[in-house]
UniProtKB/Swiss-Prot annotation:
Coiled coil: none annotated. It comes from Trichosurus vulpecula. GO terms for biological process: animal organ development; growth hormone receptor signaling pathway; positive regulation of growth; positive regulation of receptor signaling pathway via JAK-STAT; response to nutrient levels. It comes from the Eukaryota. Pfam families: Hormone_1. This is Somatotropin. PROSITE patterns: SOMATOTROPIN_1, SOMATOTROPIN_2.
Length: 215
């Protein structure tokens, strides 16, 4: 065989072997790694939003008013209108596929509102991280979708739809009404991320028994 023909054949074999690895957005990963990555993303994002909530509260909400405001914030959380588990015990009664669908629904309900987050919070080190929230939210969405593809054998099935979505964050921080609105939205965002994190940790723990299951 001529040298040129041998080189062409070698290149053809090389590209054939590399082709399947480059066909997807992410390389194939074990299910345990997919769960571990999703849990870490959810934990980090939940903590980031919790810190932002605390900083917003400290900066804009008088301490004497916090309790009365917090007691009425549940009305802002549209996620309460879906039959999602409210805690670890309830989550353990649901299948993994159900929990993934609830998690995805909660995450996707915030993709639009959080795009305005960085325009609202610009004067603090904590608020300065808010421009990363959308990116991290999309990363978590992709992680959950990857898990759903694995558990549903790659099929795409319809799920629940949140009929009422969250409003965008208000950029007018000089208005008391806007401050209360943003405070309520941050509270709901924090609660919804806590739910999603809980669901992912429940699934990971019952599939891969480990010491961190106590939470």
């Amino acid at each position: 065989m001529a040298p040129g023909a041998r080189i062409s054949l070698l290149l053809l074999i090389t590209f054939t072997l590399l082709g399947p690895q480059r066909s997807g957005a992410f390389p194939a990963m074990p299910l345990s790694s997919l769960f571990a990555n999703a849990v870490l993303r959810a934990q980090h994002l939940h903590q980031l939003v919790a810190d932002t909530y605390k900083e917003f509260e400290r900066t804009y909400i008088p301490e004497a008013q916090r309790h009365s405001i917090q007691s009425t914030q549940t009305a802002f959380c549209f996620s309460e209108t879906i039959p999602a588990p409210t805690g670890k015990d309830e989550a353990q009664q649901r299948s993994d596929v159900e929990l993934l669908r609830f998690s995805l629904l909660l995450i996707q309900s915030w993709l639009s509102p959080v795009q305005f987050l960085s325009r609202v919070f610009t004067n603090s080190l904590v608020f300065g991280t808010s421009d990363r929230v959308y990116e991290k939210l999309r990363d978590l969405e992709e992680g959950i979708q990857a898990l759903m593809q694995e558990l549903e054998d790659g099929s795409s099935r319809g799920g629940l739809v949140l009929k009422t979505t969250y409003d965008k964050f208000d950029t007018n921080l000089r208005s008391d009404e806007a401050l209360l609105k943003n405070y309520g939205l941050l509270s709901c965002f924090k609660k919804d991320l806590h739910k999603a994190e809980t669901y992912l940790r429940v699934m990971k723990c019952r599939r891969f028994v480990e010491s961190s299951c106590a939470f």
